[in-house]
C-alpha cells in the first residue's frame, strides 16, 4: 500500500479529490517545556472516488492510532518528510460527500520563528516565553495537519488551553473562557472561510490599548507590559486605515475585531493574519521622545499595508503562490494611498519611488523572475517574497492606475473585491474585472508586465522636429535583449503639464513635429527646450536619451524646471545606465553636479544612494581618484546638511527630520572629518550623561562617527556602544547599535562583531544588521568568517530569508570575476532551495560590478571631469 501512497510524492500541489470545509482545533502550548499538543477534527468533502486523504504535515508527531475518518482507521499511514505530506490510505473507497477526519498530534514550540514557535521577552527581570504563530507561506502544517494551500479555504473553530494568567489571542473574539486552577480554556468564535496561512495564535503577557472604527469594530494594539503608550500611533493609523479601506472597496471590514500585536522575535516586518496582525516591534511601536521620524513613517506604512491585506489577501485570496503579487503588490500600493490620505505633508508618493527603484534594480538582473512565477515546490515559495512581488507589483499597479484613471480603477477594484469575496482569484480574474469596468484592453496591456521577466529601456533620439523611440529589455550586465512590452508612454515637452500619452506597442515609434515651434537657436539655448519621458515615473521602465536631450534635461534640472519625481527618475536612470555601460560615469557626475542646490528629502535620498554606490565602486575601479570623488560628493551634500544642522528645529517638517540622518550618515561614510568629529563629540556628551539629549534622528550618524575611529588598540568607543546596546530597552536604539558594529577596518573588531550575532544578546531576526554594516575594507575578513562559520550559520539561522540576507550582505561587496568564481565554488555544494535565488542574484551583481569597474577604468576623461567639477563646487 505504501507504494501506492508514493504516487503523491514530488507534486507541487495537493490532489483535489478531497477538501476541508471546517477545522475544529484544540491546542495546548506548554511554554515552560516549549512543546504543544493538540487535536484536530476536520470536516472534509470527498468529491471524487478515492481511498486516499492527502494533506500537509511537517515537524509534527501524529498519533497514528488516533486517526479516524468517519470512524474508519486508515490501513496505511505514510509520512513523506521531503514533501511535507501525510498520506492516509484506507482499505476501500471513501464515501462521497462530507465526513469528519480526526487525529491527535504534538510538536515543539521551536525557536525558528515559523510555524508554532516561542519568542522570549523580559517581565519583572525574568526571561519568559510567549507562544506565537507564523504560518505564511507554508508553515500552518507545523502546527496542525491541514490542507496547507491558499485555495483550500475553510472555517476555523479554535480552543486553547493556556496558563490562566496569560493573554490568549486568535483570529476571532473569545466566546467562552473557563478557568480551572492554573489552566484556562479559551474558546473562540468560528471564523469565516479563510486560508490556513492566515490562522493565528498569540499567548503571553500583554498590555493593550483600544480604539473603534466607524462601523463599531474594536481595534486593539497589544504590547509588552508597560509599553502600551508606544502603540498609540499605530492604533490611530489602524483605525483610520480600516475606515478608509471600507470606503475605498465599498465593502465593510469582514471581522468583528482587529488585534495588532508586537512580537519580540519575528522574521518578517509583519504578518496580516485575519483579525490578528503580528508585527516585529520596530514596525508597530513608536515613542514620541525616543523614536525617529523614519520609524514613525515605517510604522504608518506597515500598519496600512497589513490592514489592506484584510481585503486584498484575506477576504480575496490568491489561488496559488504564483499570484502572490495580488496580495503583496496591492497591499504595498494601498499602503501608500492610505498614508498619503492621512499625512499628505509627507509627500509619500514621491517616496514610493524608493520601491520602484528597488524593483527596477532587481528586475534588471538575468536572475530575476516574473511577477507571476511558477512554483513547483513549497521550498521555492519564500524566495519570491521579494522586491518583484512587492515593489514591482505595486509599481505596475501604479502604472495601470495612471493609465486607466483613479476613479475607474477604484471602481474596478471594489467590483473585484465583491465578486471574489470569501474565495480565491488569479491574476486573469483581476484583469477581466478591470476590462469589464474600464472598457480598456487591460489583459493585453498587462500580461507582459506580469508574465514576462524584466522591463524595457526606451531609447529617445531627436531627429529634426521628430522624436524616435526604441524599446529593448534593460539588463544591468549590459547585454541586449529585444524584449517587447506594451508601454504606457507619457511625454512632457518643456513643461510637466504639456504631456502626450500613448501606448508604445512596437519596437520603434516616431512622434512627429513635437518641437516644430522651436527653431535650432531655441534648442541650443540652455533650458529653452527639453523632453522628459515617463512623467512622474508612473511607468515601470528606464529611459536613455541621446546626447542632445541629455544635455537639455541636465540644464532643465539645474534650472529647477522638473518635478521631484522626474528628478529622481533622471538620476536613477543615469546611474543604472552607467552601471550597464550605456553611459559614462562622467555623464552621471555632470548630472549629479546639476543637482547641487537640491534640498528635497526624496531627491537627496536618491542622490545620496547614488553617490554611495559610485564612491564604493571607485575604490576598486579608480583608487587614485577615489579620494577626490568622495570630496566631490561631500561638497554636493554638505550645504544642505549644514543648513539642517544636528539639532532638530521646533517647527521643522517631517521630511526635514527624515533628511537630517540621511545627509549626516552619508557625510560620515564619505569620511568628512568635521561631521565625524562633531558626531564623536555629541556621542561623548550623551554617553557621559544619558539625561543629555542625543536626538533619535542623529544617533546613527553619531554612532557611525565613533566606529570610524575604533581599532583594537582604541576600542573605548566600541565598548561604549556595546554598553548602550546592553542597557537599552528601546528596540530602535539597539538596532541602531547593531547597524554600525562592523563599520570599521580593524579585523579583530569586525570579527568580534560578527561573532556577537551567535550570542543570546542578539535576536536572530536582527543579526543581519551586523553583516550589512561591513565596509569594503573589511570584506575579506567577513568573507573568511562566513566560510568558516557557514555550518553554524545555517544551523542557527534556518529561515531562508535570513540566510539570503547574510549571503547578499557579504557577497555583493566584491567586484572581481575571480572572487565571483571563488564564491561560486564555495557554495556549489552548500546551497539550499530557499536562498538559491538570492545567491545567484548576488553572484550576478558581483559580475556586474566587475564589468562596471572595467568600464570606469576605460574612461579617459573621468579624471578631468572630477577635477573640473571639484573646482566648480
From Swiss-Prot:
Motif (Dileucine internalization motif): 721-722
PROSITE patterns from the UniProt entry: ZINC_PROTEASE
Domain of life assignment: Eukaryota
Endoplasmic reticulum as UniProt keyword: yes
InterPro entries assigned: Aminopeptidase_N-like_N, Aminopeptidase_N-like_N_sf, ERAP1-like_C_dom, M1_APN-typ, Peptidase_M1, Peptidase_M1_aminopeptidases, Peptidase_M1_dom, Peptidase_M4/M1_CTD_sf
Domain comment quoted from the record: Dileucine motif seems to be involved in protein-protein interactions.
Amino acids binding substrate: 136, 269-273
Family indicated by similarity: Belongs to the peptidase M1 family.
Biological process terms in GO annotation: peptide catabolic process; proteolysis
Site residues (Transition state stabilizer), renumbered to this chain: 390
Topology class, membrane: Peripheral membrane protein
Co-factor remark: Binds 1 zinc ion per subunit.
Known cofactor(s): Zn(2+)
Subunit (UniProt): Homodimer.
Catalytic residues, chain numbering: 306 (proton acceptor)
Region (Required for membrane association) location: 96-203
Descriptive protein name: Aminopeptidase M1-D
Keyword RNA-binding annotated: no
Enzyme nomenclature, EC number: 3.4.11.2
Catalytic activity: Release of an N-terminal amino acid, Xaa-|-Yaa- from a peptide, amide or arylamide. Xaa is preferably Ala, but may be most amino acids including Pro (slow action). When a terminal hydrophobic residue is followed by a prolyl residue, the two may be released as an intact Xaa-Pro dipeptide
Binding positions for Zn(2+) per the UniProt entry: 305, 309, 328
SUPFAM superfamilies: Leukotriene A4 hydrolase N-terminal domain, Metalloproteases ('zincins'), catalytic domain
Molecular functions (GO terms): alanyl aminopeptidase activity; metalloaminopeptidase activity; peptide binding; zinc ion binding
Keywords in alphabetical order: Aminopeptidase, Cytoplasm, Endoplasmic reticulum, Hydrolase, Membrane, Metal-binding, Metalloprotease, Microsome, Protease, Zinc
Location within or outside the cell: Membrane; Microsome membrane; Cytoplasm
GO-annotated cellular components: cytoplasm; endoplasmic reticulum; extracellular space; membrane
